[in-house]
Amino acid sequence: MEKLAVIHTAFEDKPSTVAFVDVDESLSLIDKLEYAYRWTNNVMGSWSRTDLEDNGDYNPAVTRVAPLHEGGMGLRSTSVGDQILVGNKKYVVAMMGFETLEGEKI
């Protein structure tokens, strides 16, 4: 397994690593990025909360490392402008797909 870091930067004053996502090393780069993106989004529950009984967004491959918000509210979804670290290279969530920090499409 390979560990990716999800870094929220789009709406924060400073970058914050919010999760580590374990992915199969044999996946392509785009598949790794898409997996990390999908499983740090709130679609059918809360990706960052483990205490919900019916939580379609829970995935044991995702480890939340940022604290929950006051009152136990979950973390926001990964959005355009956020970053995913694969190995030692960061990729940015783009309007469609992903880009390098230099703006090259993946």
Residue positions per predicted region:
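N-terminal disorder-to-order initiation segments that are Gly/Lys/Arg-biased
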Residues: M1-R38
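Short, compact, well-ordered microdomains
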Residues: M73-I106
